[in-house]
A protein has these predicted regions:
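An acidic, glycine-rich "communication" segment
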Residues: 2, 95-195
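Short alpha-beta junction capping motif
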Residues: 48-105
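Aromatic-Pro/Gly-enriched surface loop or interdomain linker
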Residues: 1-53
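Structural recognition of the beta-strand scaffold that forms the well-ordered cores
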Residues: 6-8, 32-33, 53-58, 91-94, ...
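Extracellular ligand-binding/catalytic regions of CAZymes and related secreted enzymes
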Residues: 195-259
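Solvent-exposed loop/turn segments at secondary-structure junctions
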Residues: 12-13, 38-39, 60-63, 98-102, ...
Length: 259
């Protein structure tokens, strides 16, 4: 029986054709792809309850305009659909910029174990500066756990991708993969708030605590299997065979497969 995969995207630009090739390479799955906001949260809420596998590649809940960003929470129906799915033990995979989505949904970020902040804000009741980003970082992805998501992967493999410097609570998850060969310190990243205001690749007036180098993990706070993969900014990552294997493993695992 062909299993169904629901992919949610939108809210952050990406190259559609290479991403489509990534989805095609994952397996013989019946793929439904809904895009915020055109896909509609109501449509997504209905599909979320039915899909065998769920991939969040969206960054919803933001409006960027004129050098500012505003946020809004997901609809009650959308939240209820995801909460009900997890309550039934049906899992999901969140990828790359999904870590930033739904800034006004604390439960979502509690399940994920962290958040990417486009503006200075709060995480776990503490004030935090806006988060950092760095494109096209060449690093070694090192496997740190024997887990269905990492099955069949070499102990270490090269990745060139965007990395984040942001609040991450390692007590909320089981680490699976870490990025080695690159320091997660403010002087290696750029300010997200500066980028929003029009100053890309700037860290002027910005500082940030050193951060976690964990780039793949399984949540320990979500009632269903929830895996986050920070890999996934662009075509080089989409085409990386080890990233493809890890994503396919994660989708299989979170849908109740054996990995």
């Amino acid at each position: 029986v062909t299993r169904s995969l629901l992919v949610l995207s939108g809210g952050h630009p990406y190259e559609e054709a290479p991403f489509g090739q990534l989805l095609d390479a994952l397996g013989d799955w019946d793929v439904t792809h809904l895009i915020h906001p055109e896909g509609g949260e109501a449509d997504a809420a209905d599909a979320i309850g039915r899909a065998d596998m769920l991939l969040f590649y969206d960054m919803a809940g933001y409006t960027f305009a004129n050098g500012t960003v505003t946020t809004h929470p997901p609809s009650l129906a959308f939240r209820a659909a995801i909460t009900a799915r997890f309550a039934r033990g049906m899992g999901a995979v969140a990828m790359h910029h999904a870590f930033a989505g739904w800034a006004e949904w604390p439960e979502w970020h509690g399940w994920l174990g962290g958040a990417f902040l486009y503006q200075p804000g709060e995480w776990q009741g503490e004030p935090w500066p806006d988060s950092g980003y760095r494109h096209d970082v060449a690093y070694d992805a090192r496997i740190v756990a024997d887990h269905p998501v990492t099955r069949g992967l070499p102990e270490s493999f090269p990745v060139t991708d965007e990395l984040y410097l942001c609040p991450i609570d390692e007590s909320a998850f089981t680490p699976l993969v870490r990025a080695e060969g690159f320091a997660f310190t403010a002087n290696n990243f750029y300010s997200a708030a500066n980028a929003v205001s029009g100053a890309m690749f700037s860290r002027e007036g910005w500082n940030h605590p050193s951060g976690s180098n964990c780039i793949a993990w399984e949540s320990r706070t979500c009632p269903a299997p929830l895996v986050y993969l920070q890999c996934g900014d662009g075509p080089a990552t989409y085409a990386n065979p080890h990233v493809r294997r890890m994503l396919a493993n994660a989708l299989d695992y979170t849908s109740g497969g054996t990995g």
